[in-house]
Each structure stands twice: as C-alpha cells, then as structure tokens.
C-alpha cells in the first residue's frame, strides 16, 4: 500500500508479514543515484477484496519499506503519480488522481482533514 505522502509498505498487511522486502529499497536508491535514473512503484489501485491500495495513512502496524523521499513515481491502472520534488499536498493530489475512482472523494476528505491538502 502507498500513503498519501508517498511512503510504501511492501512486506506486510498491518502487523502481518507476508513477504520480505526483497530489493525494493536498493532498486529505489540505485535509481535515485543513477544519472537520468527513474524509479517506479507499480500497484493495482485496489486489493482483491476491493480496498484501496492508496490510503491516507498506512495501515496500523504497516512497515515502511520505502520512505517518501525515495519514491519518484507510483503507477496504477489509472495513471502515473509524479512525486519527486513535490510538496505533501502535491503528492496527495497526484496519488488521489491515480487511486480507484470509488475512493478519490474519501482520500481527498482525509487529506484535507489531516492538513495535507487545503
């Protein structure tokens, strides 16, 4: 899952570990350091149960595998969010735009409630 600030949880669902982190951090770090390098996190917009993979906040207990400052792009079937160099509000807008349409209003409400977006 991805939080509206851009941080990524890739190894757990809440407190339940479902995989290792693999090389995600190394890939993101290497891409950021490479001249002209770009990194992408590709996810479906929803879980198999129909829940949004883009969330206002990561689920309680979720581990941050990739911090927000390392994430450059997030891709869903609805487009690409360009996060590098963006403010928290801009990041939230970009991520909401690629969230499943059924969750965009709720994500916008949560972002405004938390002061991420005005």
Which sequence ranges carry the predicted segments?
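Conserved phosphate- and dinucleotide-binding cores of soluble alpha/beta proteins
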Residues: 1-118
